[in-house]
Amino acid sequence: MFAIIETGGKQIKVEEGQEIFVEKLDVNEGDTFTFDKVLFVGGDSVKVGAPTVEGATVTATVNKQGRGKKITVFTYKRRKNSXRKKGHRQPYTKLTIDKINA
């Protein structure tokens, strides 16, 4: 069985036991988190939401809160002696999908 959930403005296909990286969630490590925005549930019986599936939830355990790899953003204006170098690390949450309730 699999499901498509929405979190952080993205749609993610998940299965039970899968580890996923999502945009940072405001929960502590070791806690459980429940996704209510389930857009699709597939498997033996297919359920399509309009826009979400009624009563369907996906439960996950928080493994880690972290920050992604550093990227460097460099902007400049030609012939103006104007340059700016800036770094960014995107925060993320690592989850393990425990159960899909449909």
Swiss-Prot record:
Keywords, alphabetical: Ribonucleoprotein, Ribosomal protein, RNA-binding, rRNA-binding
GO molecular function: rRNA binding; structural constituent of ribosome
Signal peptide: none
Top-level taxon of the source organism: Bacteria
InterPro entries: bL21-like (IPR028909), bL21-like_sf (IPR036164), Ribosomal_bL21 (IPR001787)
SUPFAM superfamilies per the UniProt record, alphabetical: L21p-like
Gene Ontology CC, one term: cytoplasm
Coiled coil start-end: none
The keyword Glycoprotein is annotated on this UniProt entry: no
GO biological process, one term: translation
Family annotation (Pfam families): Ribosomal_L21p
Assembly mode: Part of the 50S ribosomal subunit. Contacts protein L20.
Family recorded in the similarity comment: Belongs to the bacterial ribosomal protein bL21 family.
Protein task: This protein binds to 23S rRNA in the presence of protein L20.
Name of this protein: Large ribosomal subunit protein bL21
Gene that this polypeptide is encoded by: rplU
